[in-house]
Amino acid sequence: ERQLRQKIRIPADGEVPLNHQQKRFLRENYAHLTTFTGAYEAERFLGLRAIQAMQLRNMTPGYAALGAYLFSQAMWLAWEVRQNGYARVNFLARDGYYVKAAFEQLNEVLRLPVETGYVRISRQAALPLQFPKAIDLLSLPLLLDMTAHTPDSLLTLLRPIATENARAALAAELPMNQRMDARTQWNFVRIFREKGYDAEKYQQYEKDAKAYLLPMFAGKCATFDVGYNLRSETVIQRLTGADVTAYITHIDSDLPMRRGVPFRTLYGTSPYVSWVAREQFLLERGAATIGYDAHGAVLGQADAPSRAVQQMQADAMRFVADMADTFGVRLMDMHFRPQDGCAAFEHFLHTGAIQAGAEVENAFLDGQAGGDTTRVQWRLMQTDAEQARHPLPKWMRKLQRAAIRLAHDPQSIRRKL
């Protein structure tokens, strides 16, 4: 650990050989980055605990798994910046926060001629911007799961473009605090489109959002976000008209191909565990963006911090700092696939997150746009991971999943029964 802490600067001249300490660090970390797939296979076929094997000198999974993940993502972006000549890389809040921190840490030694920015945007803030006209509200059921909302909670999301009497119009025909189903969601769309949509308020909201976004997207830009359907990037491109290429970890449907925004993904396929389970390790611990006004982005209530996740994030940034301090500009010449560098973290999400004690402290990771389905999905992911290690009979698995859903949505279960 003391050796890793030493500030070992490598000259830019590629002919200068590595010293003993640098070679040792290279063996323990660079080889570590390129052999995760083998560690995963070892656990599958030999019954070994790959996460324990991947820890370096009793480091936590935050250093060995999440640290390598952030390092690999940041190096992927660094290579793309050098190849494509981007003037600016904007990281989208809030799951781009730690990738931004890792990229800036590495760029202190790489010295790429690129600016970085942090754009506060979220599903909740971007949702009203997707309805320039009242007729566009017909796409609302395609943009979010309306059955996870009540009319009251969904009206809260659409408040920036709603008339003063929108609530009264909805309350006259719909129970405001009851979850919507396949029929009532279209009633909500009809009522809000006819009586609740305010075109003037939309114009003002769009003006405020554009005033916030435009200064950040001058010249040839790239954006980074975890994923998954380019909703935010589409809004940004429409409002700013900028030359933007979106970089995301992966997609989970064919929707991004239809949005018209050029994008590149780190993963060629969608991983087994994603969304809330992944994002909680990458999030800025603070408040989500809930909208825009004349002063810029409007923030909501701050999240309750998770000490386990915060410790992993701190350890991960130590890994990035150690790699930057040890190898310097030679990082650009390291030959490894960033996907391999991410494999340990993927394996951790698949098998180790429950044992690590990492839990979702806040059910609403991106404002309120996901309803309360976030916690349900996290519980189901935990159940799936446990069953992968200790398979249960099919009838028991179905009963277990039904019990989780019953605890969060008893009305839907009663309707099905």
Language-model features, listed with the residues they occupy:
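Long, low-complexity, Lys/Arg-enriched
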Residues: 1-417
